[in-house]
Regions:
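Active-site-adjacent loop/helix segments that line or gate small-molecule/cofactor pockets in enzymes
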Residues: 1-28, 42, 75, 190
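Glycine-rich loop-to-alpha-helix module at the N-terminal edge of alpha/beta enzyme cores
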Residues: 7, 36-125
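Short, acidic, Ser/Thr-enriched surface-loop or helix-capping motifs
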Residues: 31-32
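Residue-level signal for well-ordered, solvent-exposed loop/turn and beta-edge residues enriched
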Residues: 35-36, 220
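Short beta-strands and strand-loop turn motifs
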Residues: 38-41, 169, 208-213
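PLP-dependent aspartate aminotransferase-fold enzymes
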Residues: 85-207
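Conserved PLP phosphate-binding loop immediately N-terminal to the Schiff-base lysine helix
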Residues: 210-223
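Conserved small/polar residues in nucleotide/adenosyl-binding loops
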Residues: 227-232
Length: 232
């Protein structure tokens, strides 16, 4: 057991009191004590359709037998193009290009690179500053940690984080939002902090703003009404 170093886990305590899952089916895990445990996190949001769905298993098996892997350098499989097209058709009209990555961390770091690269090729090389949000989680890559706002994830790596990052305040205020149904009505004014940050640094230096629609890892914080689409 000591060979595996678990992430985001106090390993010394875990080895004394291990939680071992042996199987999963539908919305449940089954541990080594025979207990049936409801998976309230959907496999850390990676299994939203449940575990061990035979239809998904059959599709994976069929694809593996046809083509298990095709490098994306100078070539691609027909299935990859078909999947990209399906994703683009389901996305908002302005999001019509797909770039595949292996994880959320890789996706965030890639998105930051795309933002900076885009501005550079457009002749705006000064646009390198990123804006994230307090308490945000954007993965474990250095870019994601930099734009993220979780202190415990950042404090040991300050010298390695990308420069030029600022953070918006988070939207949680229990005194105003407790027991709200749906999106809270209070808090839209917090979006105005973005204008202050842009004015502070000059709009010509901003490369991108990155926000989680719902801040998951810090408590499933639902944004307030009009936060991401403030009225003019």
């Amino acid at each position: 057991m000591s060979a595996y170093w678990l992430p985001f886990t106090p390993n010394r305590y875990f080895h004394q009191h291990p939680k071992i899952m042996q199987s999963a089916k539908g919305a449940y895990y089954y541990d080594d004590h025979g207990r049936k445990l409801f998976d309230g996190l959907s496999g850390l949001w990676c299994s939203p359709l449940g575990h061990a769905d035979p239809r998904i298993g059959a599709a994976i098996s069929k694809q593996y037998e046809t083509m298990d892997y095709c490098p994306a350098f100078q070539m691609a499989s027909e299935d990859t193009f078909r999947l990209a097209t399906r994703i683009a058709e389901m996305a908002p009209k302005s999001l019509d290009k797909v770039f595949f990555t292996n994880s959320g961390s890789e996706a965030v770091d890639t998105a930051l690179k795309i933002a900076v690269g885009y501005h550079r090729v457009m002749g705006n090389a000064s646009r390198i500053r990123m804006i994230g949000r307090d308490r945000a989680y954007h993965g474990v890559g250095m870019g994601g940690i930099s734009v993220g706002g979780m202190v415990a994830n950042r404090k040991m790596f300050a010298s390695m984080m990308i420069p030029g990052v600022d953070h918006l305040p988070h939207t949680l205020n229990l005194s105003q939002m407790a027991f709200s149904k749906g999106m809270p009505a209070w808090g839209a004014h917090l979006a105005e902090e973005l204008e202050k940050i842009v004015a502070l640094h000059d709009a010509n230096t901003i490369a991108a703003v990155i926000l989680e629609p719902v801040q998951g890892s810090t408590g499933v914080i639902v944004p307030c009404l009009l936060y991401t689409s403030p009225s003019p």
